[in-house]
């Protein structure tokens, strides 16, 4: 069962390939309101002058926790997992980041080190920006300054959600329900009727590490959610039919 489940997630990661990065950010079909890259056309043009584009295969390391943060990265396509912990010990998945996410912003602004490690779950395209070039870009554009503040606030909200999921949810079902809702909000899409849909990118083992339980318990709990009609998992996609039910578990 575990091998089949891992194979299914691997297929999903291969299926959800990131789109090719467009010639210009303004032409990118992935952009959404509220993302850092959803800036005015003139500001975007200046951003492109200080960035390049890189591609990562699946399961490739982008940066490691504790490294000097010399660059930040805008995700144009694909998905990465962020982990924290001691390198010689167990790693905890902090969250999954997708298109529109900015990685390493706080570390770059504070002239510090990366607080997490980043590894691609799928092939991904990114725009790296060197620290000094990004700081110079911010000094020239107040719109970008405000967007950077908004991104920092979003990172704080993600960290608070992570802490609440582990510390405040008393049952595994409540913690897993919170995790599904977080994934839906971070990498999913809204559906008519109030539901959400997002790609299944994590194995049950990985989800278990995020909710402090075992893989078997995650499998059993997801099965109960499906039996109750709260979620469905089909064609490598998770659909939350009744997110309010998951929320009520907390």
How should these model regions be labeled?
Residues 43-44, 95-161:
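Cyclic-nucleotide recognition modules
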Residues 2-58, 102, 107-109:
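Cyclic nucleotide-binding regulatory module and flanking cytosolic helices
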Residues 183-250:
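Phosphate-/nucleic-acid-contacting segments
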Residues 41, 77, 99-102, 123, ...:
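ATP/adenylate-binding site constellation spanning eukaryotic-like Ser/Thr protein kinases
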Residues 83, 105-106, 136-137, 179, ...:
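Residues that scaffold the ATP/ADP-binding catalytic core of kinase and kinase-like folds
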Residues 139, 143-210:
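Polybasic "coupling" helices that flank or enter modular domains
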Residues 53, 96, 128, 201, ...:
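Short aromatic/basic micro-patch
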Residues 35, 44, 60-123:
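Cyclic nucleotide-binding regulatory domains
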């Amino acid at each position: 069962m575990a091998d089949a489940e891992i194979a299914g997630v691997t297929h999903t990661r291969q299926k959800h390939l990131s789109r090719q990065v467009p010639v210009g950010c303004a032409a990118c079909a992935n952009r959404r309101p509220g993302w850092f890259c959803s800036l005015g056309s003139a500001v975007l043009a200046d951003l492109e002058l200080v960035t390049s584009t890189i591609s990562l295969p699946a399961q490739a390391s982008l940066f490691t926790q504790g490294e000097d943060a010399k660059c930040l990265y805008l995700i144009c396509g694909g998905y990465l997992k962020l982990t924290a912990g001691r390198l010689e010990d167990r790693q905890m998945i902090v969250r999954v980041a997708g298109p529109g996410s900015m990685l390493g912003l706080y570390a770059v602004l504070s002239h510090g080190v990366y607080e997490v490690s980043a590894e691609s779950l799928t092939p991904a395209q990114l725009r790296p920006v060197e620290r000094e070039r990004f700081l110079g870009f911010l000094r020239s554009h107040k719109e970008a300054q405000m967007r950077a503040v908004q991104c920092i606030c979003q990172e704080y909200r993600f960290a608070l959600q992570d802490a609440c999921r582990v510390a405040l949810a008393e049952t595994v079902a409540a913690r897993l329900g919170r995790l599904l809702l977080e994934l839906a909000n971070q990498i999913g899409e809204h559906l008519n009727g109030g539901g959400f849909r997002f790609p299944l990118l994590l194995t049950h083992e990985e989800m278990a590490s995020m909710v402090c339980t075992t893989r078997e318990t995650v499998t059993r709990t997801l099965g109960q959610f499906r039996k109750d009609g709260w979620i469905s998992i089909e064609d490598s996609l998770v659909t939350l039919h009744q997110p309010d039910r998951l929320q009520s578990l907390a």
